[in-house]
């Protein structure tokens, strides 16, 4: 066989080995590339509020009414109200709950093969996502009232009462906290995808405990017996957040994105006059 013939056959055989790749869409991803924590990151990122929602809820509404914004003359400070802002908040908040829920679903129904590390880490990640989902749901029910407990299943869900949602959230936190393994550590890539605690299991556990205490206290007038029992049960699970370094906080950055804080953007200095808001 000539050298040219051997080279040609080698090229054909190589091409045949790669032929199946033509059926793989380069714009899609397979289960082995889907990391559940990407969805949790999407929820955390969105909850920081992009300039559209952040400006309307914080600056035009809260900051103007609280006289924390020097640009007076709009929003509730002059007695006007725009339902568009609250409609947007409803939609945004639903998306944050959806993304946290997706993280949980991807762990409960794996899309690919897990590594030995992922088999240890993902059960913890599920509990962290459950805690964050409760945080998002608490914001939703406190702002809009009844909320669905069986949402994001592809059908229109039924909305449950505030009482039922609160009872569910408290039970969810208790179970999630009890199932966190503080001995499991994330790898470097996983750490980078959690801007709150870098997937530190102990910090997430304390966060869940403190959130349970907070929600219990919100029931202190409406349901004092439940508030007392849940708060005491939360204390029995651990210390909760007691130090500054355990605080749930996300770093803000300048610019026009979810990461730019609504009260600290360089292009919106919100300067205040020394005399504009004096009361005679």
Predicted regions and their residues:
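Membrane-proximal, proline-rich intrinsically disordered regions
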Residues: 16-75, 84, 109, 113
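Bacterial N-terminal signal peptides that target proteins for export
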Residues: 1-3
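Extended ligand-binding clefts on enzyme/binding-domain cores
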Residues: 33-34, 232-280
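C-terminal motif of bacterial Sec signal peptides marking the signal peptidase cleavage site
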Residues: 11-15
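Conserved, well-structured interaction surfaces
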Residues: 69-188
């Amino acid at each position: 066989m000539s050298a040219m013939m051997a080279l040609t056959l080698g090229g054909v055989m190589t091409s045949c080995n790669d032929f199946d790749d033509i059926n793989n869409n380069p714009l899609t991803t397979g289960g082995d590339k889907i990391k559940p924590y990407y969805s949790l990151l999407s929820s955390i990122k969105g909850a920081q509020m992009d300039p559209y929602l952040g400006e309307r809820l914080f600056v035009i509404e809260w900051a103007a009414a609280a006289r924390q914004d020097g640009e007076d003359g709009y929003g509730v400070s002059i007695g006007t109200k725009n339902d568009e802002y609250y409609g947007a908040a409803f939609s945004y908040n639903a998306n944050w709950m959806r993304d946290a829920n997706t993280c949980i679903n991807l762990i409960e129904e794996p899309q690919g093969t897990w590594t030995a590390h992922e088999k240890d880490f993902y059960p913890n990640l599920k509990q962290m996502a459950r805690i964050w989902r409760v945080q998002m749901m608490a914001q939703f029910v406190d702002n809009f009232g009844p909320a669905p407990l069986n949402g994001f299943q592809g059908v229109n869900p039924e909305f449950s009462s505030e009482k039922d949602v609160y009872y569910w959230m408290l039970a969810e936190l208790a179970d999630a906290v009890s199932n966190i393994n503080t001995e499991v550590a994330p790898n470097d890539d996983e750490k980078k995808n959690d801007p709150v605690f870098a997937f530190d299991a102990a910090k997430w556990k304390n966060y869940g405990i403190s959130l349970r205490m907070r929600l219990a206290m919100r029931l202190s007038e409406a349901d004092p017996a439940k508030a007392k029992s849940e708060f005491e049960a939360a204390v029995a699970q651990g210390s909760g957040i007691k130090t500054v370094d355990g605080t749930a906080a996300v770093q803000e950055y300048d610019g026009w994105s979810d990461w730019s804080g609504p009260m600290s953007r360089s292009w919106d200095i919100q300067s205040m006059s020394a005399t504009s808001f004096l009361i005679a």
